[in-house]
Amino acid sequence: MQNIFLAATLLGAAFAAPQNPPTSCSAAPQPTGTGSPGTVCGSTTFTNYTVKAGDTLGAIAKQYNSGVCDIAKVNGIDNPDYIKPDQVLSIPANCVTPDNTSCVKPVPVITNTCVLGVGSTYTVKSGDSFSAIATSFNITLASLEARNPQIPNYDLIFPGQVINTPLCPNSVCDSIGTYVIESGDIFYNLAQSNNVTVGQLESLNVNVNVTDIHPGDIIILPHNCHNITASA
């Protein structure tokens, strides 16, 4: 009988003892961004990716089965054509409905045949083509080819080669000075805000890698290049 009472006492004590609440596992931190898994393109997860030299959003999107515009949206990228090495991106991976079009602006028809103010030569870089160079100066391909009759094959150019760009007569820049790169600067935005082209910036900064600039770097920066009216 004593054993029965002892067992009952122990059993009651077991039920009466306070139970420790279950320990919850903290969720893994999510990469920073403006969306969350499931709200962007139907993605169920975000992945951090550090941009390398030569990367494009298109290639990164393809690698992670994402969308160019989805990545741009999450990371606050205004121009999907311009990302910088060492930039950390939050990638919505395995998109159900990837968006590759909504953020892409229509390509403007280029009709200019000369460059305003400055930039009469350009030094070819690895990966360049005549077409890409013409676009960077916002001039037609035909006008760039016409300025370089010394080149026998426009499809065969090499790094370090200097080509001519057609400079507009009676055109000037309001100023040409130095500029110290600040955090967040990219060449495309600097060109737009100073009313010049990326090609002009590249032509004046031959030894600068335009996709890999850092705060404190010093570049040559023209401002507001334009046509002038000849004096009467």
Swiss-Prot record:
Coiled coil: none
Record-linked SMART domains: LysM
Sites carrying sugar chains: N48, N100, N138, N195, N209, N227
Induction behaviour: Expression is up-regulated during wheat leaf infection.
Classification via Pfam families: LysM
Further remarks about this protein from its record: In plants, chitin acts as a microbe-associated molecular pattern (MAMP) that is recognized by lysin motif (LysM)-containing plant cell surface-localized pattern recognition receptors (PRRs) that activate a plethora of downstream immune responses.
Protein known as: Secreted LysM effector Mg3LysM
Organism annotation: Zymoseptoria tritici (strain CBS 115943 / IPO323) (Speckled leaf blotch fungus)
